[in-house]
Regions:
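Amphipathic alpha-helical segments
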Residues: 1, 21, 25-34, 162-200
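Accessory (non-catalytic) regions of SAM-dependent nucleic-acid methyltransferases
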Residues: 1-19
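Basic chromatin DNA-binding modules
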Residues: 3-4, 33, 133, 150-151
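Non-catalytic DNA-recognition/assembly elements of restriction-modification systems
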Residues: 16-43, 59
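A short beta-sheet element
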Residues: 43, 55-56, 61-63, 70-138, ...
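Short coil/turn segments at secondary-structure boundaries
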Residues: 46-54
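Specificity-determining recognition surfaces
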Residues: 137-166
Length: 201
């Protein structure tokens, strides 16, 4: 999201994007994901125990996220008993569901409380506009893949996600950027819906 700009007066490299809203100035601050969010993994209840499944808790897998900014309903659900008897965690609304396996770096925002399987390192924002963080983490997909490891399949750990470095502006600028990118996403979704309707008609 950010690239280095040059102050022609002092020939100093600044940590700011080349394109920026004119009302903002000053450098962006470098922080780690750990500074901005709590990183939480997931888990899978025992699939042989019927009482763990078909409950009220949405339970996402990596194949269900990344296609849209927001996700609401999952293909499978788990019960509170299943949640408590697994490493799955109950995540609050507006959690960034970040895939840490398979297609590493895919993400969506949850609209409600939910849980995930172990193929995630989810981000619960603590010091950052969650929409801004959603767009920001997508610019770090190459870093996420590069820091992944594994003999059977690539996976990035919670600790490696926490170490990812990002550049962050003020809260007001975060909100402005997030609003613009969200508007663009909405326009794209509207156009895609129009195309789908035309194809199906």
């Amino acid at each position: 999201m950010t690239t280095m700009a040059i102050d022609n007066k002092d020939k100093k490299v600044l940590n700011v994007p080349h394109l920026r809203f004119p009302e903002f100035s000053g450098e962006w601050v470098t922080k780690s994901i750990n500074d901005l969010a709590v990183v939480i993994g997931g888990g899978t209840p025992d699939t042989t125990v019927k009482s763990y499944w078909d409950g009220e808790i949405q339970w996402f897998t990596p194949s269900e996220i990344g296609k849209n900014k927001y996700v609401d309903s999952s293909l499978r659900t788990i019960t509170e008993v299943g949640l408590n008897n697994s490493s799955a965690k109950l995540l609050p609304p507006n959690t960034i569901l970040l895939s840490s396996r398979a297609t590493i770096g895919e993400c969506s925002l949850s609209l409600r409380e939910c849980a995930t399987n172990q193929g995630f390192q989810c981000l619960v924002s603590k010091k950052c506009n969650v929409d801004f963080l959603y767009y920001l983490i997508q610019t770090k997909k190459k870093d996420l893949i590069r820091k992944s490891c594994g003999s059977t399949f690539l996976e990035i750990s919670a600790n490696e996600v926490r170490k990812i470095q990002v550049s962050v502006p003020s809260d007001v600028e975060q909100q402005k950027i997030a609003e613009l990118l969200s508007l663009i996403d909405e326009r794209i979704a509207t156009q895609n819906k129009i195309i789908e309707d035309l194809i199906s008609s």
